[in-house]
Amino acid sequence: LAAANAAMETARKAPRLAIPSDMVGVIAAYENGLKGRLYAIVNDVVQSGALGGTRPPYVRELTQVRTLAPIPRPRMIMNTAVNFYSHIAENAPAEQRAKAIAERKANRGVPYMFLKAPSSVIGTGETIVIPYGRTELDWEIELATIIGRPARYVSAPRALDHVFGYTVMLDISDRGGRPPGGFTGVDWFVMKGQDTFGPMGPFIVPKEFYGDPMSRLKQTLLVGSDQRQQADASDMIHSVGEVIEYASSLVTLLPGDVIGAGTSGGVGMGTSVRGEQVWLVAGDEITATIDGIGTLRHKVAAAPAPPPGTGSYLPPLSTYRRGRGAAPAAAPAGSGGRGRGQ
């Protein structure tokens, strides 16, 4: 991008403008003069015929480059739990599930949000790793909103004014929970924060090219050739604007921050679609697509056992559960059990 800008400045005698060195810098400068320059660069490349014949070194086929995560280590990732009606009580009997959905429609409450580790982010084509001994790994496709302007106490109707664009995200989840003993609540760090649990990309589409997510969103996830999830925004409990409004009431949002909109029904822990729980296994391939943005593609592999002499680590699920996908084994009195997934 910097090379293309320098070439245009020389050939077109355009005013000099510094190009930021990373995506967060691009996002922060986008509405402060950079957007017009990027448009001009693209138009110049197209109109000069640089896409055909002999190309300058800064014009390449997408297949000739490796597509990294757009923001390899975001400052902050906030995800929204259970924000699609079809994801409510997915593993409950039909009557109980219908009741839970009706109750939520009658009282939506406020979004339920959690932080995801920035170190979990990987780009399309990178491998999702099942941690050693963890046999209940799940998939969730989400629309991720990228903040473009600082936001604090913004209203839902004005929230999209603070958005830079949108990308695809997978919220990979370890549903195995904590072993018995100690703290008894849901361990969100175990479930959501481990390495490779935050695939993101392949691109960020600026909001002016994507449109209103509440009318545009269509997302689909496949494991192999089997479609596991498909949804649009009509299934969402809180809109993208409402989620940003709530998030900005808790913390100051800055350019490059990522906000996941939540996932729909069809995740592995749910029984309402397939009648049984199904988990990711080594050799699986995930294809996650949001229309108008792009597709994430990831293979799944199992991590080896930790090396001898390793200190404390999360034990294999088989040491405190009766087997893959089985109900929790009985725990000693007063000990912790398995937390519910989100």
Model-derived segments and spans:
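Short catalytic-site patches enriched in acidic/histidine residues
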Residues: A94, Y112-P131, A151-R152, T196-V205, ...
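Catalytic-pocket segment enriched in acidic/His residues
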Residues: H87, S173-G334, G339
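A generic local secondary-structure boundary/capping motif
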Residues: R66-A69, I101-R104, I128-L137, E142-L143, ...
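Residue-level "contact hotspot" at macromolecular interaction interfaces
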Residues: P70, E136-D138, T252, W279-L280
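Non-heme Fe(II) oxygenase catalytic core, chiefly the N-lobe of the double-stranded beta-helix
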Residues: N83, K116-G177
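Structural signature of FAD isoalloxazine-binding scaffolds in flavoprotein oxidoreductases
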Residues: E95-I122, W139, L280-G292
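N-terminal non-catalytic cap/leader segment that marks the start of a structured domain
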Residues: L1-N107, P111, E285, P307-G309, ...
